[in-house]
Amino acid sequence: MSRTLSMRRRQRLEMYYKKVPSVFTVTSNQEESTLQLVNNKPVVIEPFRSSVVPLGVYLRCLPGYACMLLANTYRNVTFHPGLIDPTYMGELKLICNNRTDAYVVVPAGRLKVTVLAFTFLSPILTGPSVLSPPQYTDDAGYDLCLDQLVMVLPLKAFTFQLALTCPIQSKNFTPVVLGRSGLAAKGLSITPCKWKGDVLRLSMFNHTSETIILPEGSRLCQVVFMHNDHLPTIKPRILAAFLFQHRLMDMPFCQSRVSFIDIQKDPCTSTSTLFQDSTGNSISDATRGSKGLGSSGI
């Protein structure tokens, strides 16, 4: 037994999670490279507003790694691709939006959730920049703020163009634009995209029945510098669909080869260490802790 565990620890880096009772059940095996869940009870998605569904999972990422929270079910329900920052200690929550004007009931077994790990770069910003550094220590996302007021009409798609070049250029890392969980929880979704060239084109959708106003200077989205290995370029797209199981909206996505381990089933680690840093100290106020939804907070 001890020899098997020793061999396991030499094979891959490990991410520990804790599962508490919820309407979701973990379906992936111990040490798999993805954490997968499925609903064990019906989930109701309301129209004209976002539904925030707790998953009953607490996850501790490794230093230098963050995670993506992806989900899929019926086509008339969309999900916010959630960025789980390394120091986020709160319960993972899924933000759902309904494309119809009626309640959607997702029966048990039809809402599938996947958590994937990836590596990212935390560049140092020198001088004035269109990006703001992460709010909390070790966060992955850099904030992009509006230089003008923006209004998104109810139940409408809106495309917003910014004549901006990404201030950080890297051969090995790609700037990826993600929506903020705070806005997603209010009903405004942003389609993930790569930031290329000198124009940033953002696609948004207001799922609510009211106009959403974004004041000048407010945080619109976040930029994460993902390693190129996670974003393979495969053409044609139909081939990419066969080669890669996971997608970040339209982009094929490859996860890091880590092992997700249920800390309550692992004899090597105590549950008391899940919310401590590597020195054994409790998480400080400078880190995210349980603030927000694991992304930019609400």
UniProtKB/Swiss-Prot annotation:
Annotated binding of substrate, by residue: R180, S181, G182
Cofactor(s) for this UniProt protein: Mg(2+)
Cross-referenced InterPro entries: dUTPase-like (IPR029054), dUTPase-like_sf (IPR036157), HSV_DUT (IPR034745)
The entry's keywords: Hydrolase, Magnesium, Metal-binding, Nucleotide metabolism
Assigned EC number: 3.6.1.23
Pfam families named in the record: dUTPase (PF00692)
Gene Ontology terms describing biological process: dUTP metabolic process
MF (Gene Ontology): dUTP diphosphatase activity; metal ion binding
Catalytic activity, as annotated: dUTP + H2O = dUMP + diphosphate + H(+)
The protein's role, per its UniProt record: Involved in nucleotide metabolism: produces dUMP, the immediate precursor of thymidine nucleotides and decreases the intracellular concentration of dUTP to avoid uracil incorporation into viral DNA.
HAMAP family: HSV_DUT (MF_04031)
Entry's family note: Belongs to the dUTPase family.
Name recorded for this polypeptide: Deoxyuridine 5'-triphosphate nucleotidohydrolase
Organism whose genome encodes this protein: Alcelaphine herpesvirus 1 (strain C500)
Lineage: Viruses, Duplodnaviria, Heunggongvirae, Peploviricota, Herviviricetes
Gene giving rise to this polypeptide: DUT
